[in-house]
Each structure stands twice: as C-alpha cells, then as structure tokens.
C-alpha cells in the first residue's frame, strides 16, 4: 500500500510518499513561497536504486499549481509510474474543533465542516481544504483521510479544556482549549512506551514538542489530559515568535499605549514576540552563540524559554502523579542540548536526572538521556508526524478494501 501525506500551509506544501509494507518513505519534498514572486520546489527520492534530488526555483501561482508540479515530478523522476497507483492520501488538518475527534474519511460533509472551522484556524484550514479539493477534482477515486492536529487532545476532561469565561461563549462560539501538535505528541508517546516496554494504555508521560512552535502535553494512560496550547497555537510555552502565556489585559494595554489596532497587536504577539521579541532572533543556533559570548538579551530569552517549560513540567507532574518519561522532540527538543539541560536542571528531587555526556552527544534516533537510576526517564525521540498521519490513514483505507 502506498500512501501520500500532504501538509498544506498558507504558502507551502510539504509531502511524503510512503510504502506502508515497511513504513518507509519513497519520496519527500516541499513547494514553498506559493503566491510570491519566485517560489521553490524540492523533491527527493528515497529509493535505493533511484536516489536523486530536484531543486528548482520557479513561480508557484497557488496551491493547485504546486500540487500539479509535485504530481508531475513524482512520475517524471520515476518514483511512481502513475499517480493513480497511490492507495490513499492522508491530509494534515490543523483544526478539528469539537467536530472531529479522530481521523475521518473525507466526503462533502467533512469538507464543509473543515471549511466552517476556518474561523478557528484562518491561516491553516483553508489551505488544508485546498489540498483536499484538488485531489477530489483530479483523482476522485483515491480515498482521502483527514488527520486532525487537535484530535489527540479530544480526550482532555472539560475542567482542563474550558476557559473560566461566561459559559455561553463556549456554547455559542466554541471558545475552549483545543491544543495542537497532537499527531506529534501521539507518535512520540507510542514510541516511548514501546522503547520502555510499557503497555501504551498504562503509559504516563510529559511530551515536549519544541520547535519554532512549541507545546507540552500531559499524557495519562496513553491519552492527552492537558496541553499548553489553547484555542489557538499562541498560548502556552515561549516560542520562536509567539509570546505564549500572557495576561490578556496586555492586548488592550499595548493597543492604548502604542496606538495599535487589535489586528496590529495580534501580529506583534504572533510574529514579533517570543524569543525574537526578547533578543531579536528566533534561530536557536544564533541565540546560543550570542549567549556564550555573554549577550544579556540572548541569555534572558534562553532562560525565559527554559523556565516556562520547567513550570509546565512541574504542573503536569502534579496532574499525572506518576510519570514514566519526559519526552523531548521536534527541532529544538531534538537538537538543542543546552535547552534540555537547563529544563531538567534542579529537578532531581522529582526523579528527573540527565546524563550529561549522553545529552551533549546523543547521536541519532531514539535516545535515553537519563541517569541509569533516574525514576523518570528523559527520552529524546525524533518525531515523524508524516508517518503517524500515514499510519492513521492506512487504518481507515484498509477497511475500504
């Protein structure tokens, strides 16, 4: 079975094609800067007998044009003979709201609901829907499965996902915590349970997906019971350009003091805050280099980021009571050893103790970073959201045969 995974952003398309016999990628790639003056198309073949890479700068007018280019080059490069040989397509859909708690086979009704949920994810859901609509028109016989970023967190109890606002705002406008990165949190939690030889249904963990966008999740008996992101991905941890948790009154105060519109303030919170807001840079490598040279702003940004993560670990340990593992994943979680060290520092009384030499040089793949006698394992697990989407799509596609 061959499954194509599509992840359409506001101006990009990421894809990965899998052979599900061995869960191995056949090809992967990216179309970016869609709608801009000059875009870029990258496609890499992972076939042993046909290793090649395409990199091309060209105009990519819209998402449909990008998908056409990907389809054309998959056959031109000899990765597949015909696009119609693909058994199913799994789509990453960012916002499933209260409607979608699990992956679902796409039909007209599902497409309408994804469209309606665009109000909660105006940058992402319309792009996700554009990919679904393209395939529906061009290849109506290929089953499409929508996999929602929010679905893993659908198991949160109401006391964790509700905001202390007038209840009618939830009833009328569905204002609540949804959480994101669910596919990633789910994938690494399953990998961790497998690695520790623990039944997933009994597994408790704190998963830290740390990238330019970051979130923490409390996982109890294999299910999400709390997460740091909220109605949108703005809440929670300090991120590359997002502020994370702040006093809501700050929005009004900035608007008044700086004479900004609501839209302008939200732009500041989403794109000009976080690490970038504190030190002018959201590239962790630059921040680390500056910090080592004694740059005070870089040091402050780093310390604020680590401190916020540490606070969430403490909160989630109180929620879970028993924790089998702390999981670090995604770009920063997998590659930023100094951040992992700072986050875990001083948590020995909670059973968390890093083995510094392993943390500094973890190598590749899944690694246990903890001291041998540590009560709580600290694991570095590379995430693979595309594979998790493919696995969930496969489960539904197989039932159709």
From Swiss-Prot:
Mg(2+) binds at residues 7, 385. Keywords: ATP-binding, Cytoplasm, Kinase, Magnesium, Metal-binding, Nucleotide-binding, Transferase. The active site is at residue 149. The keyword Chloroplast does not apply. GO terms for molecular function: acetate kinase activity; ATP binding; magnesium ion binding. It is found in: Cytoplasm. Its cofactor is Mg(2+); Mn(2+). The keyword Cell inner membrane does not apply. Disulfide bonds: none annotated. Pfam families: Acetate_kinase. Substrate binds at residue 92. It comes from the Bacteria. The record marks 181, 242 as: Transition state stabilizer. Mg(2+). Can also accept Mn(2+). ATP binds at residues 14, 209-213, 283-285, 331-335. Its main location: cytoplasm. Pathway: Metabolic intermediate biosynthesis; acetyl-CoA biosynthesis; acetyl-CoA from acetate: step 1/2. GO terms for cellular component: cytoplasm. InterPro entries: Ac/propionate_kinase, Aliphatic_acid_kin_short-chain, Aliphatic_acid_kinase_CS, ATPase_NBD. Homodimer. Catalyzes the formation of acetyl phosphate from acetate and ATP. Can also catalyze the reverse reaction. Belongs to the acetokinase family. This is Acetate kinase. The gene is ackA.
């Amino acid at each position: 079975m061959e499954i194509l995974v599509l992840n359409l952003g506001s101006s990009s398309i990421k894809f990965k094609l899998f052979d599900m016999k061995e869960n191995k990628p056949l090809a992967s790639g990216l179309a970016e800067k869609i709608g801009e003056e000059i875009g870029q198309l990258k496609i890499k073949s992972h076939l042993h007998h046909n290793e090649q890479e395409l990199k091309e700068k060209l105009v990519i007018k819209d998402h449909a044009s990008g998908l056409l280019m990907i389809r054309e080059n998959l056959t031109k490069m000899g990765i597949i003979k015909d696009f119609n040989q693909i058994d199913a397509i799994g789509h990453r859909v960012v916002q499933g709201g209260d409607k979608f708690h699990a992956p679902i086979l796409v039909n007209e009704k599902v497409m309408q609901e994804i469209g309606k949920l665009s109000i909660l994810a105006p940058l992402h859901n319309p792009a996700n829907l554009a990919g679904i609509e393209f395939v529906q028109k061009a290849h109506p016989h290929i089953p499409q499965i929508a996999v929602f970023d929010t679905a893993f967190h659908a198991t949160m109890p109401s006391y964790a996902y509700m905001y202390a606002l007038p209840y009618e705002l939830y009833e009328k406008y569905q204002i609540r915590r949804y959480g994101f990165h669910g596919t990633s949190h789910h994938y690494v939690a399953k990998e961790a349970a497998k690695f520790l030889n623990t039944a997933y249904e009994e597994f408790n963990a704190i998963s830290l997906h740390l990238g330019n966008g970051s979130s923490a999740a409390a996982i109890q008996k294999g299910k999400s019971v709390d997460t740091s992101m909220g109605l949108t991905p703005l809440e929670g941890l300090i991120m590359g350009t997002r502020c994370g948790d702040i006093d809501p009154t700050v929005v009004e105060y900035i608007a008044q003091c700086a004479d900004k519109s609501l839209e302008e303030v939200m732009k500041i919170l989403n794109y000009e805050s976080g690490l970038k807001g504190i030190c002018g840079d959201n590239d962790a490598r630059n921040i680390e280099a500056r910090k080592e040279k004694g740059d005070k702003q870089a040091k402050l940004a780093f310390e604020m980021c680590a401190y916020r993560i540490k606070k969430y670990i403490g909160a989630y340990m109180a929620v879970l009571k028993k924790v089998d593992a702390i999981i670090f994943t995604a770009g920063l979680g997998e590659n930023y050893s100094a951040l992992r060290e700072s986050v875990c520092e001083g948590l020995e009384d909670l059973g968390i103790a890093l083995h510094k030499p392993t943390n500094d040089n973890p190598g590749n793949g899944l690694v246990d970073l903890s001291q041998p006698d540590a009560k709580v394992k600290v694991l570095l697990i590379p995430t693979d959201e595309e594979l998790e989407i493919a696995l969930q799509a496969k489960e539904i596609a197989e039932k159709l045969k």
